[in-house]
Amino acid sequence: MLHARRLMGFVLVALMALPFVAVDLFGQAKDDKTKKEPVKTDTKKDTPKEKDAPKGKDTPKEKDAPKEKDAPKEKDAGGKVALAWKFKPFYQTMTTTTDQKMKVMSNDVTQKQTQTFYFSWTPIKEEGDKVILEQKILGVKMDIDIGGSPIRYDSTAPGANNANNPLGQFFQALNNSTFTVTLDRKTYKVLKIDGRDEFVKKLVNANKQMQPLLNKILSEDALREMAEPTFNVIPTEGAVEIGKTWKKATTLDMGPIGKYTNEYTYKYEGADAANKNLDKIGIDTKLTYLPPEKASESAGGLPFRIKGAKLESKNSKGTVLFNREKGRVEKSTTSIDLNGTLDIEIGGQLTSVTLSQSQSTEVTSSDTNPVETKPADTKPADPKQPSK
């Protein structure tokens, strides 16, 4: 158990847990999208044309979207710009790239990850100040390299997946997972999330050894905290002027892995230079990591314990482009560097781990399904033949 290679593997499992679990299931702060207020009431503009809408059961239904009359006006009497969600059906594509270097027992370990998740968001109904939405994971792509050992998975191209991929079943379990999110339309706080039990069950079936850990880090509170940043990048008062700033804070308790506190400072910067129809919001993020509060707490099935940590975030920046006409975040980009040390205990032996990590995330919205659904076929498709 004390062999250096085993220890490095265990540490990697812990550090990989957050990116996998926080699939942005609901889009973390970095997955937050910029949002714009409708310029005027125009159902034809805001509603994806029928011919462009994706087909199949995964297609969000426009009839479920909140009515146009609920959208706030473009500007108030003071000339401020009003930002508000319209809660119409839309899709998200979220890509996160992580470069990580660790030094464990004088051994250098590098890890590179590129993760892409495809989501659909479908408004189901409104109940007073509440709106209920369904979020579905439509596709998952992973490209991971740990110390020169590649792991790849692509749910959109099953034939390209390696049957010997040790994490293939785990990645597959993420695909097609569905959640029901109840959101306060005024505060953008997530009041309730349904689908947690079924989601955890799927992941446990794919890897039963992870059950204790998943039960701890995928609590309902944790899922709510991960969901809120998708919507609450705009101020609750709605109307802003250039230079206006506002703050948000979230805490993500990952049990035996530790606690992550994010402090976000947003600043409205006016119309985007490249596209005047989008409003630009700058983001400054401060990420603070705290080790598990109780040293005696169960390790959640992990073969090690995190006893202490000194991690500092640097160069954190981001931009949100909000589409007021469609009432949603059109695009967001964020990046952050994390550096420091972790004190890990395994088998009664304390070891120091030096960590250096750079992460960037881009999230884009669309009216059409970014994942092409192909009919089942026993024969592999001819790449030269156009899809029908």
Model-inferred region functions:
Residues M1-A29:
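N-terminal export/membrane-targeting signals
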